[in-house]
């Protein structure tokens, strides 16, 4: 199950209370204080792990707490520190204050560890309060309470390439043939209901991560279709690949314009992201000479429009995932773009 947003209360452990204790030995009837200190409460720590791809482990949990520190004991024995609670999250997880929407942590790198809530300090035992005018203090400190915070965990997938297109244009088929991802593929809209990540091996030494985002429809930036729930996943992709389908009733030019407008409404930064264009289902030209001519005119109209707006795309390529034509060229084109972006960071 893919879960990319949860609300939960997190709490670090309370400090253990200090002990009130006195030495009791056979020949020392009125021994001095020997109360040990309470142990510190456990911390809340976030750990980023790229073997985890969803927040499903947090689903249905209202609160998670680290262990409290143990109380101090006699003979100056200190209480044990409470165990830390380590929360394993995928790359791309943000920890957000649920009340102010402030981003508190942004976990983007494998192995990243972040202390989020410090456990409460253990109280001092009565040993610490002995002084000249009070040789037998009968009090100790309570432990300090741990911290508590209501947060929202939001997952934004991190990928090198994000596929952008209407539903059922061939994105899932593409990622299934170029990567190790195996999405559901069928001839109906919104087959992809959750984002999918796939590792694309270009050659023996080079690879990149591709994200198949559920199809975007006009009005997605306002919440239509699968809307905002998945547009956010494109935000963390370095390069966008628009997948346009010549078999749709909407011309290629119009598909491109609508998709770009939805990205612009959602995020100006996303609108300015580098991108390429892939014409999918290029095998559809086999449906007859007249249909092939229509597709050629459709592509020419798109190319003329791109010239009018000064060719903002990095490339335009025709691909057939079914016949596996253009795939090798596409992978190398994407790799070159990704290498350039990585070098410019």
Curated annotation (Swiss-Prot):
Q: Where in the cell is it found?
A: Cytoplasm
Q: Does the keyword Nucleotide-binding apply?
A: yes
Q: Where does Mg(2+) bind?
A: 172, 192
| Chief location category | cytoplasm
Classification from the root reads: Bacteria, Pseudomonadati, Campylobacterota, Epsilonproteobacteria, Campylobacterales
Supply the gene name: obg
Start and end of every Obg domain? 1-158
Task: Kindly state the subunit structure of this protein.
Answer: Monomer.
What family does the Swiss-Prot or TrEMBL record give for this protein?
Answer: Belongs to the TRAFAC class OBG-HflX-like GTPase superfamily. OBG GTPase family.
Q: Tell me the InterPro entries matching this sequence.
A: G_OBG, GTP-bd, GTP-bd_Obg/CgtA, GTP1-OBG_CS, GTP1_OBG_dom, GTP1_OBG_dom_sf, OBG_GTPase, P-loop_NTPase
HAMAP family in the record: GTPase_Obg (MF_01454)
What's the protein name?
Answer: GTPase Obg
A Gene Ontology biological process in which this protein takes part is: ribosome biogenesis
Q: What does this protein do?
A: An essential GTPase which binds GTP, GDP and possibly (p)ppGpp with moderate affinity, with high nucleotide exchange rates and a fairly low GTP hydrolysis rate. Plays a role in control of the cell cycle, stress response, ribosome biogenesis and in those bacteria that undergo differentiation, in morphogenesis control.
Summarize where GTP binds, as residue positions.
165-172, 190-194, 212-215, 280-283, 320-322
**Cofactor(s) needed by this chain:** Mg(2+)
PANTHER family found in the cross-reference section? DEVELOPMENTALLY REGULATED GTP-BINDING PROTEIN-RELATED, MITOCHONDRIAL RIBOSOME-ASSOCIATED GTPASE 2
PROSITE patterns (alphabetical): G_OBG, GTP1_OBG, OBG
Gene Ontology molecular-function annotations: GTP binding; GTPase activity; magnesium ion binding
């Amino acid at each position: 199950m893919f879960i990319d947003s949860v609300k939960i209360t997190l709490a670090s452990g309370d400090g253990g209370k200090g002990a009130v204790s006195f030495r009791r030995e056979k020949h020392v009837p009125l021994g001095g204080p020997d109360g040990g200190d309470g142990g510190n409460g456990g911390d809340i720590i976030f750990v980023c792990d790229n073997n985890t791809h969803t927040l499903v482990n947090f689903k249905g949990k209202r609160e998670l707490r680290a262990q409290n520190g143990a109380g101090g004991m006699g003979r100056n024995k200190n209480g044990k520190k409470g165990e830390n609670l380590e929360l394993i999250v995928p790359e791309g997880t943000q920890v957000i204050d649920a009340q102010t929407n402030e981003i508190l942590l942004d976990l983007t790198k494998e192995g990243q560890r972040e202390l989020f809530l410090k456990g409460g300090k253990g109280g001092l035992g009565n040993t610490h309060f002995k002084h000249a005018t009070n040789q037998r203090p009968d009090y100790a400190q309570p432990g300090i309470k741990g911290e508590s915070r209501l947060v929202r965990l939001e997952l934004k997938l991190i990928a090198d390439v994000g596929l952008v297109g209407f539903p059922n244009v061939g994105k899932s088929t593409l990622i299934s043939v170029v990567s190790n991802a195996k999405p559901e593929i069928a001839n109906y809209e919104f087959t992809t209901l959750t984002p999918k990540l796939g590792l694309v091996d270009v050659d023996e030494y080079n690879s990149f991560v591709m994200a198949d985002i559920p199809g975007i429809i006009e009005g997605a930036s306002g919440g239509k279709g699968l809307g905002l729930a998945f547009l956010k996943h494109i935000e963390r992709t370095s390069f966008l690949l628009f997948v346009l389908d010549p078999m749709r009733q909407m011309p290629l030019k119009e598909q491109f314009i609508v998709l770009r407008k939805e990205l612009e409404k959602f995020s100006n930064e996303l609108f300015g992201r580098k991108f390429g264009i892939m014409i999918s289902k290029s095998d559809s030209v086999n449906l007859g000479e007249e249909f092939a001519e229509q597709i050629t005119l459709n592509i020419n109209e798109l190319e003329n429009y791109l010239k009018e707006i000064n060719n903002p795309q990095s490339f335009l390529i025709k691909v057939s995932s079914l016949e596996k034509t253009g795939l090798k060229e596409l992978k190398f084109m994407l790799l070159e773009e990704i290498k350039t972006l990585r070098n410019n960071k």
